[in-house]
């Protein structure tokens, strides 16, 4: 009996020894080079802890917003319901934009329905309305100051 308890204790300690560093690393492990300006993005309304959350950061340039190969950085975080959080080190204080999608099937594509509507959850900084089209850049642009800026976005699922 004593050896079974001892084995269980050592198994638990071994798990904690290996799991704790991994958990600790994700808490403050921000994308980018450490700077004086940090952005924390809290994605709410996550309906399932499956797949990953693609959180993309764009510079203050309307022509680069949602354009291919125009992002400043992207975090692909394991989706956690009901909230997934990620952070970025920003190059400097200024204006930025964020776009998010919930890649539930993990194929690294923003899937659409047969008629072109989003098949996966999505969100933008400032949570602008998106009834029939993508929001204009001016609606998603936000200011990040020196130190830490926190924003919250709410996922929308159309299906």
Description of each model-found segment:
Residues 76-82, 143-145:
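Short proline/glycine- and polar residue-rich coil/turn motifs
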Residues 54-58, 99:
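Beta-strand signatures of extracellular beta-sandwich domains
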Residues 93-100:
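A short tyrosine-centered beta-strand micro-motif
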Residues 8-21:
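Bacterial N-terminal signal peptides
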Residues 84-91:
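Exposed aromatic-hydrophobic patches
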